[in-house]
UniProtKB/Swiss-Prot annotation:
It comes from the Eukaryota. Keywords: Disulfide bond, Glycoprotein, Hydrolase, Metal-binding, Metalloprotease, Protease, Secreted, Signal, Zinc. GO terms for biological process: proteolysis. PANTHER family: METALLOPROTEASE MEP1 (AFU_ORTHOLOGUE AFUA_1G07730)-RELATED (PTHR47466:SF1), PTHR47466. Residues 1-17 form the signal peptide. It comes from Verticillium alfalfae (strain VaMs.102 / ATCC MYA-4576 / FGSC 10136) (Verticillium wilt of alfalfa). This is Extracellular metalloprotease VDBG_07883.
Length: 276
């Protein structure tokens, strides 16, 4: 299953460059298969906490694939500095979770269709490297109208379309220093990689008992816009909305944490699915 971020320019009389986008979810709730896998990871983790090696860092082989319309920054041809800044944000955000991203290669492809998020499977068959333990991120100037999307882990057959599709697509303008106001600190990649580690949105399930299937993320009815401190959309449930969580939809500057329960889920997904 993939998770997509939809961004829509705010309606105003201002110029397009001055418009501030809103971040909206463009994805259905996790499938039953995703929920079953998440429940299994939770159960496995409770029975085998030591087997998850919490003291050992998870080192993720990572590849950056730059897809561009032409060899200009506006066309998606990102600079080495932008890519390094994005990698630094990823490692800083996941550092407290004891996760390290080791960039093993960067590819650059000028292809108008691929840069516009078309011909996804042929593109990924040409570029994707490694197994399910390898994170392939595709940066492109247009992601079908979204900020990004990624896949949850699953037990796919090597070489299948699902296996080839595994990875994340991220809008070029969302990298640190990009042109997308409020969403240009690199946190789109952080959020999407959370999905790659089997994390759901914090607002999944609303105020229901199951929620995002993480015990220490407070329930929330809907996604967050901006950074509204004190937001509480489930007043009958413990805690305020986790607006600072990377798996909400707050502004990039508002995001700063994963919970211990989310860290545990990521580690469980890594050892029980991604490195199996």
């Amino acid at each position: 299953m993939q998770s997509k971020f939809l961004w829509i320019a705010a309606a105003s009389a201002a110029t397009a460059a001055a418009q501030v986008p809103a971040r909206l979810c463009g994805t259905a709730q996790p499938t039953m298969d995703d929920l079953v896998i998440a429940a299994g990871l939770a159960a496995e983790g409770k029975d085998n906490r030591r087997g998850l090696h919490p003291e050992d860092p998870i080192v993720v082989p990572t590849l950056f694939h730059v897809l561009a319309i032409n060899e200009t920054v506006a066309g998606g041809y990102l600079t080495e500095k932008s890519l390094q800044d994005q990698l630094d944000v990823m490692n800083a955000d996941f550092g407290p979770s004891n996760v390290i991203f080791n960039l093993t290669a960067t590819t650059r492809t000028v292809n108008r269709r691929w840069a516009q998020d078309l011909d996804e499977i042929p593109m990924r068959r040409a570029l994707r490297q490694g197994g399910q333990e390898t994170l392939n991120i595709y940066f492109m100037p247009y992601v079908s109208g979204y900020l990004g999307y990624c896949t949850f882990p699953n037990f796919w057959d090597a070489g299948s379309d699902e296996f080839i599709y595994d990875g994340c697509a991220v809008l070029s303008d969302s990298l640190p220093g990009g042109s997308l106001a409020r969403y240009n600190l690199g946190r789109t990649a952080t959020h999407e990689i959370g999905h790659w580690f089997d994390l759901f949105h914090t607002f999944s399930g609303g105020c229901g008992c199951v929620g995002d299937m993480i015990h220490d993320t407070p329930a929330m009815l809907n996604a967050t816009g901006g950074c509204p401190v004190g937001k509480d959309t489930c007043p009958d449930r413990p805690g305020l909305d986790p607006i600072h969580n990377y798996m909400d939809y707050s502004d990039d500057a508002c995001m700063n944490e994963f919970t211990p329960g989310q860290n545990f889920r990521m580690r469980s997904a890594w050892y029980n699915i991604r490195t199996k």
